[in-house]
């Protein structure tokens, strides 16, 4: 891509890579946050060569993610988590086949996004993913405002 001075790198992340906060998905979310940090840094490195990057944050799409063949739930090893773990595992199992996102529509949307000029640096896919992103933005704004005075008073006098 550098040689031809053009290209487009698309990474599929997750809504959990943008706004985590679900019980028992810390390792998954960490992997997605890592992917996103890498992509955001990569964007600055490759943009001078005409290479674009896009992070895709899909919400819940009706894929094989929650099927028994695709998902293994770890056995509980810490009793402190048992009261939350059981109901959550049952919830996830109940959602298989009920996810609101249509993967065929997502595929068509990704083709549209890939053909935009310039393509977006981020595509948040699905109404649930947008709602999560908007909540994350609101949470960040509230955290900034809660400590704005303290935070902005840290420069040398």
Question: What do the PLM-derived regions correspond to, one by one?
Answer:
Residues 31:
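Active-site helix of classical SDR
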């Amino acid at each position: 891509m550098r040689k031809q001075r053009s290209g487009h790198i698309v990474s599929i992340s997750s809504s959990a890579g943008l706004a985590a906060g679900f019980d028992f998905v810390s390792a998954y979310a960490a992997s997605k946050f890592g992917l996103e940090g890498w992509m955001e840094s990569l964007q600055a490195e490759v943009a001078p060569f005409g290479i674009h990057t896009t992070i895709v944050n899909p919400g819940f799409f009706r894929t094989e993610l929650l099927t028994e063949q695709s998902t293994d739930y770890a056995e509980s090893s810490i009793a402190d988590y048992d009261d939350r773990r059981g109901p959550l595992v049952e919830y996830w199992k109940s959602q298989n086949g009920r996810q609101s996102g249509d993967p065929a529509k997502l595929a068509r949307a990704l083709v549209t996004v890939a053909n935009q000029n310039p393509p977006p640096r981020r595509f948040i896919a699905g109404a649930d993913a947008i709602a999560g992103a908007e909540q994350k933005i609101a949470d960040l704004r509230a955290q900034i405002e809660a400590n704005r005075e303290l935070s902005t008073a840290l420069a040398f006098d």
